[in-house]
């Protein structure tokens, strides 16, 4: 009899611990003063991501992104293309899912789907800029497009 009570108490404790751990706030990594200034920019900023040899182009019209890319993002060569491709796949899947759910996610943030095919080699530059846009976007708007926190360092 006591054994059954102990099992019930243990089960309740485990479930409570699990719920508390899972419901914790998932905040974006700390934002520096310099990064906040870039996020608060008002100047128009357009970045065109393209790979001339493969004829792929992405146009990002996001105020502050180009400045952030030049001043805060990790430099080219810091990440491998494979790393960025893997992260971009996860980010794109989550992004596109949010585009399809405008009642659940802000349709002003998630306007258009991204066509990113996993078996196409878009090249380093396209992956670099797309990856960094996802990091910028998550940090600026306090969003999570994957299971990992969007960090710079």
Whereabouts are the PLM-identified features?
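Compact alpha-helical subdomains of small soluble proteins
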Residues: 98, 102-153
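Solvent-exposed, polar/charged alpha-helical surfaces in well-ordered, non-transmembrane soluble domains
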Residues: 85, 89, 93-97
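Bacterial Sec-dependent N-terminal signal peptides
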Residues: 1-31
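Extracytoplasmic/periplasmic, Sec-exported soluble proteins
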Residues: 80-87, 125
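Generic structural "secondary-structure junction" signal
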Residues: 60, 85, 116-118
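Sec-dependent signal peptide cleavage junction
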Residues: 22-61, 65-66
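Acidic/histidine-rich, surface-exposed loop or edge segments in extracytoplasmic proteins
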Residues: 67-81
